[in-house]
Amino acid sequence: RIGLVSTHMYKQFLDYQHATINTNEIFTRMIDNLQEVCEILKEAFSSRGVTTQNIYVDTDPQKSIVIINILWHKISFTTRCNFQPQALYRENGAHMFSGRIMAIRGNYNEIMAGVKDHDEEMVRLLDNEVASLFVPAESSQNSVLKIRHLANRELYLNQVDAPREFVLKVVETICGGGFYHEEGARKSFNI
């Protein structure tokens, strides 16, 4: 029986390695897409006479976090939630081992101030999550985009288009909404 367990764990390990490679490749392309979005927004706002000093992209040296600041909005993307093999639950039982790129509302570094372990990190990530892109080990298999405010409805994206589509969908979700004046309970809205 231990032989079966080791075979199962070895397959998980291989899937984890391949998913990590695919996830990192997509994340690197997302950084390029975010730079492009940033430049387009700078052009659009400067042509209207709006200062663009609050429109920028910042990455960490390990390329595991990228933050885009768009005027008063801050959006962070991270791969730091991939510290062990994990699968995306499937109703049919064919769970998909995958890497995950999380999009969160706010500045990752500010949100994680004082975090001491992975459990606490995940609680804060999930509390601020906007969407997640699940990247499978097999590069020919579609990635799965889940958007939190759409009841985690799943969108399937091929791994070529996934970086661009994920970036655009998250930017649209965050910047396409707005905030109400605070009056008791804090609320936001999406268009």
Residue ranges with predicted function:
Residues 66, 70-191:
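Intrinsic disorder/low-complexity polar-acidic segments
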Residues 49-74:
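Short, structured protein-protein interaction patches enriched in aromatics and acidic/basic residues
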Residues 12, 17, 35, 53, ...:
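Residue-identity detector for glutamine
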Residues 2-57:
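Contiguous, amphipathic alpha-helical segments that mediate oligomerization or scaffolding
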